[in-house]
Amino acid sequence: MQTASLKNGTLKIGTRGSKLALAQAYETRRRLMEAHGLPEEAIEIIPMSTAGDRIQDRALSEIGGKGLFTEEIEQALTDGRIDLAVHSTKDMPTVLPDGLHLSVFLEREDPRDAFIGRTASRLLDLPQGATVGSSSLRRQALIRRLRPDIQVVIFRGNVDTRLRKLEAGEVDGTFLACAGLRRLGLGDVITDLADPESFPPAPGQGAIGIETRIGDTRIDTLLAPLAHRETGIALACERAFLAALDGSCRTPIAGLATVNGDTVSFHGMILKPDGSEAHEIKTEGPASNAAAIGTEAAEHLRAKAGPQFFEGWE
């Protein structure tokens, strides 16, 4: 399909309007300009407001999960109002609308969670009964697993908002994705980087995913030079794991795949929301089999945890 935006010579990128989302869209534009020798005016960035951005007073798990950050943008993509959409992959549901796919992943930034502490530099050093802000069920469960004494409070809003709340003394610390902070030039606020062994990240964390229309070969050809092989393999594994567990913002699921040559290694974890129970798996296999490795890891954990473990999941 050749859209109007290509006919008039402008490539249109859809994105959320937050500073972080725009930084990711600008990074995508920069790479496209470099790959094809395009001038800046050949690529238009179109910020869009999503339900996830507008509803800031409740946890995502209460209001519908990950699709809240993508629905309006994906509709614009389906309608041909934009040519591609730039996303934080960790915010992407595993089931996409008919006719759309994640065609390219840019090289992944550091996938770890970053701790920003006000009264201590590390989670484990916070005083007894301290408060930590997080809106992620995964982070909440991991915090409670490591520090059952800590009070976890819902912490919505963009990065600047959360950092302001922290500075104002609303909480003693918070976790944010290291990649997002670095993309915003805020890496210096990080007081500790979470150990992915004990505090594994969300599947897809740190990776920019580009969504296009299936069959739009012109756009996919333009994007092909931006694709990063190892990131694509890792995310195939992580997203298959997430899909097999029916993962969304409503469920505490962690997973990280790393690629070394032709081998993919995967560490996955599922937790009860209160952190009282967790099950994990470490496995590896051929990179060509990445998605199957993720699926098998999920099936293993589902069997290991037993049906009662999932009763609280929606």
From Swiss-Prot:
InterPro entries reported in the protein's UniProt record: HemC, Porphobilin_deaminase_cofac_BS, Porphobilin_deaminase_N, Porphobilinogen_deaminase_C, Porphobilinogen_deaminase_C_sf
GO annotation, biological process: protoporphyrinogen IX biosynthetic process
Top-level enzyme category: transferase
Domain of life: Bacteria
GO molecular function, one term: hydroxymethylbilane synthase activity
Gene Ontology CC annotation, any one: cytoplasm
Modification type S-(dipyrrolylmethanemethyl)cysteine: residues: 249
Required co-factors: dipyrromethane
Cofactor binding mode and count: Binds 1 dipyrromethane group covalently.
Pathways per UniProt: Porphyrin-containing compound metabolism; protoporphyrin-IX biosynthesis; coproporphyrinogen-III from 5-aminolevulinate: step 2/4
Reactions catalysed according to its record: 4 porphobilinogen + H2O = hydroxymethylbilane + 4 NH4(+)
The entry's keywords: Porphyrin biosynthesis, Transferase
Pfam annotation, one family: Porphobil_deamC
Entry EC no(s): 2.5.1.61
Family named by the database record: Belongs to the HMBS family.
HAMAP family in the record: Porphobil_deam
Function according to Swiss-Prot or TrEMBL: Tetrapolymerization of the monopyrrole PBG into the hydroxymethylbilane pre-uroporphyrinogen in several discrete steps.
Miscellaneous notes: The porphobilinogen subunits are added to the dipyrromethane group.
Quaternary structure (record): Monomer.
Name by which UniProt lists this protein: Porphobilinogen deaminase
Name of encoding gene: hemC
